[in-house]
């Protein structure tokens, strides 16, 4: 299989879906002539024209609302946010309109929109540009959330998200855009709500999503090489729907769990997973569930200090050693 970047995988997914379905359009700030802030839409405007790739004003409330309205009429918009931090400007549109319309209309109206963009720290852009709001979005029934960790997952999940008849929020990571993985040339889809074991193990389960999966994999290699501990790494891929069956299966296999999460710890994704394990697999645990999250503070702007705030392989290793 060819090696392609996370960025190219997303680009290919968008192009393939534009070709497959005449109702798929891309909208957002600088997605057309400029090729997107992170070049995810590079070349698409040149290939498909300004009726399929549309630049919008700098008003997230405005263009997200436009996309939601269009989706209610049968269009399948893919909306790019420069940062998921800016979703709060469009919060009413996302939560009250996209998230509630199927329920409020008694199932008569659906909203097949995709909202995508980066949601991560680690790039020294400050507290207002470094939010990871997957927990907030997932708290709303009617909205779906996916956080791809690899190019393979990014392409498969994006194509599935575009074909979904409900709103799907795809949270990417700027630090992954340039990383490469093997991606098959033939078409494939990855169903939402299906986790993936990235590394088989027997001693402890490292459960993560997004770039934290890469952190967990690095930690697993250290645990094996330096401590003789065989860690299993479970990539959630999807936050809502959440693959609770896969979470419980790996915990029942290893009897120990470390949850790795760039989300903040208070009411974060890892808190939800910990509750799931507590409620359904408590008797299987040989030790308390451990968490490695971002420090509970606004994102640090300093390039020297921000890495301290985020999950690291060393922090994951320390938590694993505490319970193994």
What residue spans do the PLM features occupy?
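Thiamine diphosphate
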Residues: 1-171, 307-308, ...
């Amino acid at each position: 299989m060819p090696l392609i970047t996370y960025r190219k995988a997303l680009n290919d997914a968008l192009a393939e879906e534009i070709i497959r379905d005449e109702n798929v359009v891309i909208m957002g700030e600088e997605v057309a002539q400029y090729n997107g802030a992170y070049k995810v839409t590079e070349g698409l405007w040149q290939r498909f024209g300004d009726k399929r790739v549309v630049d919008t004003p700098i008003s997230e409330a405005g263009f997200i609302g436009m996309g939601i309205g269009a989706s209610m009429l049968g269009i399948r918009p893919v909306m790019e946010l420069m940062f998921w931090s800016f979703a709060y400007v469009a919060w009413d549109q996302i939560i009250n309109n996209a998230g509630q319309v199927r329920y409020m209309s008694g199932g008569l109206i659906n909203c097949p929109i995709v909202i995508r963009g980066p949601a991560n720290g680690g790039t020294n852009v400050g507290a207002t540009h470094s939010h990871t709001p997957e927990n907030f979005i997932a708290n709303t029934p009617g909205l779906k959330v996916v956080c791809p960790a690899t190019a393979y997952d990014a392409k498969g999940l994006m194509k599935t998200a575009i074909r979904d008849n409900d709103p799907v929020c795809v949270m990417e990571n700027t630090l992954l855009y340039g990383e490469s993985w093997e991606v098959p040339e033939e078409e494939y889809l990855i169903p939402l709500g299906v986790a993936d074991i990235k590394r088989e193990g027997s001693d402890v389960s490292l459960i993560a999503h997004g770039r934290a999966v890469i952190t967990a994999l690095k930690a697993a290699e250290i645990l094996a090489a330096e401590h003789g501990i065989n860690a299993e790494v479970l990539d959630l891929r999807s936050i809502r729907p959440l693959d609770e069956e896969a979470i419980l299966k790996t915990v029942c296999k290893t009897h120990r769990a470390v949850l790795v999460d760039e989300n903040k710890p208070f009411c974060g994704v890892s808190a939800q997973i910990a509750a799931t394990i507590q409620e359904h697999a408590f008797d299987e645990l040989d030790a308390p569930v451990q968490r490695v999250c971002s420090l509970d503070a606004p994102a640090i702007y300093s390039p020297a200090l921000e890495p301290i705030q985020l999950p690291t392989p060393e922090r994951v290793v320390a938590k694993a050693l505490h319970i193994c």
